[in-house]
Amino acid sequence: QAGVQPRDIVAVALPRSPRMVMSLHAIQRAGAAYLPLDIEQPAARIQRILTAAQPRTVVVDETTRTLLEGADVASVDVSALFTLPHPGGSATDAAPDAADLPSAIPLPTVQPTDPAYVIYTSGSTGEPKGVVVSHRAIVNRLLWMKEHYGFGPQHRFLQKTPYTFDVSVWELFLPMLCGAPLVVAEPDLHRDPQALAALIRREGVDVVHFVPSMLAAFLDEPASEGLRMNAVFCSGEALPAPLRDRFHARMQSALHNLYGPTEAAVDVSFWDAGRTDRSDPIPIGFPVWNTGLYILDDCLRPVPPGVTGTLYLGGRQLADGYLGRPDLTEARFILHPGFGAEDSPRRLYDSGDLARWRRDGAVEYRGRLDHQVKLRGQRIELGEIEAAFSTHPQCRQVAVIARVDDQGGQRLVAYVVPQSDAEPQPVVINDEALAESLLDHARTLLPAAMVPSAVVLMAALPINASGKMDRKALPAPVFAVQARTPARTPQEKQVAAAFADILGLPEQPGVEDDFFMLGGHSLLATRLAARLRDQSGVELTLGAVFEHPEVGRLAAWIERLQRREADAT
């Protein structure tokens, strides 16, 4: 009815729900490719993606239809199509009368080379880029996983990864290939380890995915201890050996390490990080079906075991390229002449990752060549963040880096040289109003995960002997607390102490200080919620930290919960 044809692109702007799952399957059945939109990202970024992708239509519901206000694109509102007692729909939704629907809608024949989905990732040029993946590519990945791990109707899968990340593809479609149940987590539940552990126990989930940093937070949650599952998969970041060992000490499950970029249908290699594995570092392992891993030097020649080179990927799972960007596709997807006299040219993807062969034939990840980083599982091009800051009228020059904080986590920090005709200033400039203005500007253009935790204003960016910017010489940010009103009540002091400890602050914050403005992020928020839950004895949720991020407000909320529990007894 919306005129969708095979090979069309249909954008989707829905919260995670059964309604979202069915919408994606409906798009596939219509022969189109789905393009997931992050409904929490700024409207300006959504508009840029829609302008670049030119979808046939956008699927929305009553909670997201306002996102398209002012956009020149058709939409399909599925609010009335599903009757679901779930956040994606309610029991009072008015479902259409079956008599009003066509009795038999002819379904198109989908070719293996047709696009299955388009996922936008961060772009180094300042614009996100859409990766086009075919049915041929993703079906290879799904069938490999089904057969390699022996999944079938007896397993229960959890869909918790946001659908704008490619891990969600196997969570959404592999259960259907296996005839297995799919448990759909409520929106934002993937951020809350306590709620996640409860859901896994309640629903009997036995196949689940974690980004390693989130797995660490999950293992910190007391409710996770002793969980029994068939398989836990990790990807998106390097899996540290100590985390593997800690996992096996707390949980009864197989642990698998997967690796792959969005440009190669989710994952291209695997490693069994089981109880007997003693690898350190843990390798990314061996290739999946019909896939080649190639470690090449600067002249595109294979390197011997133990020598670090650039990892190139080949085979059936390679993406078609970047939507509407033939220049970028040609730069990253190369045609290699082959590795022998009788070899024919082959198409390879330049991953930008450094790697080396182990003696046993497994591949070991060694870092990145460029300024791309993985932050809590999300691939981020620092160039896109720098481009956003550059559009602020007071920004003359900017550099963004990911710094390791005192707790071992990564935080994005922006270093900005402001426009100024004034006399020479100190190396680091103190202008809180300008720093906050720059951050506010970035929030209108970037997803929350890409907004830096801090802005450092500098008179000039450091230069090394060769005349290039010296990123290693950029100073560490100081997350200054406001402390206009110091914590006074016992509960305020407890919350302030937890803020200071978890964020590594040099002094205790005041009651107006905001956890996230002081450098906090979602994973640190899970630690804060767990700490205060243990100390206060109340069921403090992760959502409460996001709703009451200031010391005083969070302390007042905890006191309210304590009074409520006291009244109940």
Regions found by a protein language model. Give the residues of each.
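Gly/Thr-rich phosphate-binding loop signature of adenosyl cofactor/nucleotide-binding cores
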Residues: 10
